[in-house]
């Protein structure tokens, strides 16, 4: 299948990652995946949520937002609406869960690492790009803390990345752009670690149901895409 942007069904969009995109964050990247662009930045605080106080254990959490004109028509800021939208809550919880799955929280001490994922341009796949970029930003933050003697070792237990897969006009396609995502019959978001273990599988039938065989094909295609993302992450973290 030849797609509208010239890619084959199993190709990711072009990906560029710029580390150190923000000067003041403990770790930061700009991830560009096709026309989707997300700034991922990490801040460290010497405190933890109430439920972790005096536990000796740290925390990793995330916040997600979209700039008003990251979309074709203006998206209202959550602050203007007076509450975080349900979509933003869902996505930031997903990002937080995904990153916590690959970190030894006890190795952080009683410290919190807050990941801010701010979408500056949305062309589908913002939540998965946020996870892939957030891993690198968190890696850079941890490395800085180790270099400063604040952490005794890198606290990662695995590597994590994410990708979207859609069924578009009856075809399974990797990393859909907006036009494909908008018209997709089925949408999937896959999060996986480098032990080939899935952290999260989200699948929604928008206009068509799907079979177990189709699900297996989606997982196989998504897994192949995530291994490519691991290589891209490693080009920054393990040059």
UniProtKB/Swiss-Prot annotation:
Homohexameric ring arranged as a trimer of dimers. Keywords: Nucleotidyltransferase, RNA-binding, rRNA processing, Transferase, tRNA processing, tRNA-binding. GO terms for biological process: rRNA catabolic process; rRNA processing; tRNA processing. It catalyses: tRNA(n+1) + phosphate = tRNA(n) + a ribonucleoside 5'-diphosphate. This is Ribonuclease PH. Gene3D superfamilies: GHMP Kinase, N-terminal domain. It comes from Dehalococcoides mccartyi (strain ATCC BAA-2266 / KCTC 15142 / 195) (Dehalococcoides ethenogenes (strain 195)). One of its GO terms (molecular function) is 3'-5'-RNA exonuclease activity. Its EC number is 2.7.7.56. Phosphate binds at residues 87, 125-127. InterPro entries: ExoRNase_PH_dom1 (IPR001247), ExoRNase_PH_dom2 (IPR015847), ExoRNase_PH_dom2_sf (IPR036345), PNPase/RNase_PH_dom_sf (IPR027408), Ribosomal_Su5_D2-typ_SF (IPR020568), RNase_PH (IPR050080), RNase_PH_bac-type (IPR002381), RNase_PH_CS (IPR018336). It comes from the Bacteria. Phosphorolytic 3'-5' exoribonuclease that plays an important role in tRNA 3'-end maturation. Removes nucleotide residues following the 3'-CCA terminus of tRNAs; can also add nucleotides to the ends of RNA molecules by using nucleoside diphosphates as substrates, but this may not be physiologically important. Probably plays a role in initiation of 16S rRNA degradation (leading to ribosome degradation) during starvation. Belongs to the RNase PH family. The gene is rph. It is an enzyme of class 2 (transferase). It holds the Pfam family RNase_PH. The keyword Nucleotidyltransferase applies. HAMAP family: RNase_PH.
């Amino acid at each position: 299948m030849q797609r509208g942007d010239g890619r084959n069904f199993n190709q990711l969009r072009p990906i560029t990652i710029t580390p150190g995109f923000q000067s003041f964050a403990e770790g930061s990247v700009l991830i560009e995946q096709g026309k989707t662009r997300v700034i991922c930045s990490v801040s460290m605080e010497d405190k933890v949520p109430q439920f972790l106080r005096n536990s000796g254990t740290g925390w990793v959490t995330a916040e997600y937002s979209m700039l008003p004109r990251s979309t074709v028509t203006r998206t209202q800021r959550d602050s203007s609406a007076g509450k975080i939208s349900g979509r933003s809550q869902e996505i930031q919880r997903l990002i937080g869960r995904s990153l916590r799955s690959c970190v030894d929280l006890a190795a952080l001490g009683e410290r919190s690492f807050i990941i801010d994922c701010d979408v500056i341009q949305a062309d589908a796949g913002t939540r998965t790009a946020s996870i892939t970029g957030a891993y690198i930003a968190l890696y850079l933050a941890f490395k800085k803390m180790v270099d400063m003697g604040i952490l005794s070792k890198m606290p990662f237990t695995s590597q994590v990345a994410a990708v979207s897969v859609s069924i578009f006009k009856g075809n399974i396609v990797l990393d859909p752009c907006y036009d494909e995502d908008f018209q997709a019959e089925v949408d999937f978001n896959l999060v996986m670690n480098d032990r080939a273990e899935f952290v999260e599988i989200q699948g929604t039938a928008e206009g068509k149901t799907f079979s177990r065989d189709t699900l297996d094909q989606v997982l196989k295609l998504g897994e192949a895409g995530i291994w490519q993302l691991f290589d891209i992450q490693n080009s920054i973290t393990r040059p």
